[in-house]
């Protein structure tokens, strides 16, 4: 089996080289590799022959990458940006998005077919797996997104996205064996919603099907912070539990388990959308179960490499998928290091005594110890990827996995059987679902409690926290490679001490200057953080929905700020306040300042209710206010019906003043200037994200800013900032700093 390992490894290396280095390499390189491969095979030495197998994998990988691009990607390049009529077949049920709905479909256009995602607002019928779809849409290719740095679609084998122009027409489709997994998934979703209580149905749906639409943003974020998000993203864990359950039902008969389990696992993987981690686990488990049947020994490196070969043969660009990278990195760490770590820990005198008896307590302890060893081992290769991709390292992960993973195994098996039972006997399934909901609630309680801890995760916002992450990685590596070199309690104490020191340095670095002002990168929105002395203020908190509130919370927590003195909302547009609820969940806010003249709307009502629930004092601003740290809040000068009416804020510092005008229009700026004697402000936050109707010449002349900050999303659909605004700022002689170009902007003084 090692030859398969060498060939698969060479194939994977070739795919990585092609995607990152040799994409435009000439064909002569393939010819040279072919010549080297042939020469090596002519030599009879075993070591050379093995090298030849690896080179053959390299040759096959490079040739397949080039052929795949020519066969499946280039035929669609000419369609990018065009609007055309199409026909398609739905591959799954539609999902809600921020701007409407989307559905995965097999799209046919000019005689060419490919997997695509259709975005639409309205349809003339119900969409089910197999439904025939037609309409007119603007097309965007995966290559165009790849050129802009977005590899998500390409890594999933989605070659086109189509934004419908007008209604999407639907017709009932014909049932087919190919769509049976998707149709069963839809029936299971309905069964889960019918059988399980509303507070646990979303979690069960995510655990069994990988469909996280029933989970709130808050729960998904808590799962990520607690380091157990993999539980609701169908992965190798789910496939392993499924096959383990089938093996148990087969009484340990490996032949029968292989005969029943492999088709069941394949069906489950397709039903859940064939995520890379599940496919990887399916291939690995198939090799493990089949190895004894063909009189071969299981070889972990071979199973890992073979699984990667299957995925890359299907789509070489899958290597760009973060889920695939994390799945293989975690699995490699567990395969190579978990066993040795478990043996080392189980040799501890106290643990060995507890593990020796064969009873329920020792079985539970073994499961928890296994979870701990797997969690630490998985970090060896996965932690750098997590840190680079997400900028977060969960410190709570080892503890949460120990406490919750064994319960999730029970919940997965019970939930799957209950959902299947609900298809036939809903009443009986309801009783099982009620009982199964209690361990689900316990898991969620553990996750939410862990996520609320002040240091549940490291947010890699500065060099101190990056240093802590590097130390933790080195410690995990040491425990995995040489488990007997250091005692576990010593490693835990060192981790706590170093993390605490780095957090202390991070807090001191933020607190040392007299004042600090930051414009956070929240996309197309605005969130500003101002600190003067010990007083911390957040002005607006909106952008990419709840993510803007989480961005603000992580910025504050990384600097040791767990309490905000005041949150000031200039107005109630979503891009200035839709992250408030998440911010209130993550940090304590003492006082909320809002404009009195804001017209009633649903978002305003929800935010005020959330603030009241969080114990935050609410103050409606009807007159100008001067706060103890010198910050001034200017009340609205217009009526409630005027668009973009709201508060203005002037943050006063020893070295500079900063003026923030929210979304004030040019007319509102004139009224502000006529009713207030504004000082010269070194920094001006451009109104309305740099829109043409804000940041007027009159305001620029009065304030005389040295720098203008613009909070704006990259490639936003509003074309902010406007060219006219940039010309006015340049004419005023001020420098421009934009979050879409520079990320988070910080001024220290």
Annotate each PLM feature:
Residues 57-230, 550-557, 563, 597-599, ...:
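Membrane-interface helix/helix-cap signal primarily in integral membrane proteins
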Residues 2, 22, 36-37, 53-55, ...:
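Hydrophobic alpha-helical transmembrane segments in multi-pass membrane proteins
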Residues 591, 671-743:
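Cap/insert and terminal regions of metallo-dependent hydrolase folds
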Residues 574-611, 705:
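Active-site HxH/HxHxD metal-binding segment of metal-dependent hydrolases
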Residues 564-575, 597, 684-688:
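Metallo-beta-lactamase
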Residues 212, 312-320, 448-566, 612-683, ...:
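Core dinuclear metal-dependent hydrolase active-site scaffold
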Residues 1-76, 184, 280, 479:
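N-terminal leader/targeting segments
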Residues 157-290, 518, 566, 591, ...:
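Aromatic-rich juxtamembrane segments at the membrane interface
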């Amino acid at each position: 089996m090692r030859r398969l390992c060498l060939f698969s490894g060479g194939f994977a290396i070739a795919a990585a080289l092609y995607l990152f280095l040799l994409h435009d390499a000439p064909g002569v390189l393939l010819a040279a590799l072919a010549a080297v491969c042939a020469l090596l095979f002519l030599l009879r030495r075993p070591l050379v022959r093995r090298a030849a197998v690896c080179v053959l994998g390299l040759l096959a990988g490079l040739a397949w990458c080039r052929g795949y691009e020519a066969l499946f990607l280039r035929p669609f390049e000419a369609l990018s940006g065009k609007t055309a009529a199409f026909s398609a077949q739905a591959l799954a049920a539609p999902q809600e998005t921020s701007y409407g709905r989307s559905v995965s479909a097999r799209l046919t256009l000019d005689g060419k077919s490919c997997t695509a995602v259709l975005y639409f607002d309205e349809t003339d019928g119900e969409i089910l797996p197999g439904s025939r779809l037609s309409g007119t849409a603007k097309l965007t290719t995966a290559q165009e997104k790849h050129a802009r740095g977005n590899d998500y679609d390409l890594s999933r084998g989605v070659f086109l996205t189509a934004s419908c122009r007008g209604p999407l027409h639907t017709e009932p489709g014909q049932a087919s064996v190919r769509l049976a997994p998707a149709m069963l998934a839809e029936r299971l979703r309905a069964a889960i919603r019918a059988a399980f209580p509303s507070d646990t149905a979303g979690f069960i749906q995510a655990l069994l099907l990988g469909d996280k639409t029933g989970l709130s943003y808050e729960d998904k974020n808590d799962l990520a912070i607690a380091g157990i998000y993999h539980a609701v993203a169908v992965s190798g864990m789910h496939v392993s539990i499924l096959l383990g359950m089938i093996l148990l039902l087969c009484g340990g008969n490996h032949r029968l388990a292989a005969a029943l389990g492999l088709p069941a696992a394949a069906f489950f993987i397709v039903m859940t959308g064939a995520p890379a981690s599940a496919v990887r686990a399916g291939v690995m488990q198939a090799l493990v179960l089949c190895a004894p049947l063909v009189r071969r020994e299981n070889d972990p490196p071979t199973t890992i490499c073979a699984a990667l070969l299957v995925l890359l043969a299907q789509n070489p660009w899958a290597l760009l998928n973060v889920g695939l990278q994390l799945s293989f990195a975690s699995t490699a760490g567990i395969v190579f290091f978990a066993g040795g770590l478990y043996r080392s820990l189980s040799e501890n005198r106290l643990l060995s005594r507890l593990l020796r008896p064969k009873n329920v307590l020792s079985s539970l302890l073994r499961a928890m110890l296994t979870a701990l060893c797997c969690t630490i081992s998985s970090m060896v290769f996965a932690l750098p990827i997590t840190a680079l991709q997400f900028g977060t390292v969960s410190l709570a992960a080892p503890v949460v996995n120990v406490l919750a993973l064994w319960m999730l195994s029970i919940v997965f098996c019970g939930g799957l059987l209950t959902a299947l039972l609900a298809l036939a006997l809903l009443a009986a399934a309801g009783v099982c679902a009620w009982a199964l909901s209690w361990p689900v609630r316990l898991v969620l309680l553990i996750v939410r409690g862990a996520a609320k801890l002040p240091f549940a995760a490291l947010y890699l916002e500065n060099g101190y926290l990056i240093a802590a992450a590097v130390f933790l990685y080195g410690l995990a590596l040491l425990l995995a490679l040489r488990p007997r070199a250091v005692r576990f309690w010593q490693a835990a104490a060192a981790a706590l001490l170093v993390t605490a020191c780095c957090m202390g340095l991070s807090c001191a670095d933020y607190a040392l200057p007299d004042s600090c002002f930051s414009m956070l990168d929240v996309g197309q929105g605005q969130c500003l953080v101002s600190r003067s002395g010990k007083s911390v203020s957040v002005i607006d908190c909106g952008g990419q929905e709840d993510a803007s509130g989480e961005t603000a919370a992580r910025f504050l927590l990384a600097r040791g700020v767990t309490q905000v003195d005041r949150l000031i909302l200039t107005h109630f547009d979503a891009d200035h306040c839709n992250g408030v609820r998440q911010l209130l969940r993550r940090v304590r806010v003492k006082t909320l300042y809002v404009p009195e003249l804001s017209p009633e709307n649903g978002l305003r009502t929800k935010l005020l209710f959330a603030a009241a629930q969080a114990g935050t004092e609410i103050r409606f601003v009807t007159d100008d206010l001067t706060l103890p740290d010198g910050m001034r809040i200017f009340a609205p000068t217009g009526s409630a019906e005027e668009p973009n009416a709201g508060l203005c804020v002037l943050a006063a510092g020893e070295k500079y003043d900063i003026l923030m005008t929210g979304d004030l229009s040019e007319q509102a700026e004139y009224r502000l200037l006529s009713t207030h004697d504004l000082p010269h402000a070194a920094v001006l936050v451009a109104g309305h994200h740099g829109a043409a109707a804000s940041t007027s010449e009159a305001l620029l002349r009065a304030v005389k800013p040295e720098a203008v900050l613009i909070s704006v999303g990259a490639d936003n659909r509003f074309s902010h900032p406007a060219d006219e605004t940039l010309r006015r700022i340049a004419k005023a002689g001020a420098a421009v700093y934009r979050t879409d170009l520079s990320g988070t902007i910080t001024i220290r003084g």
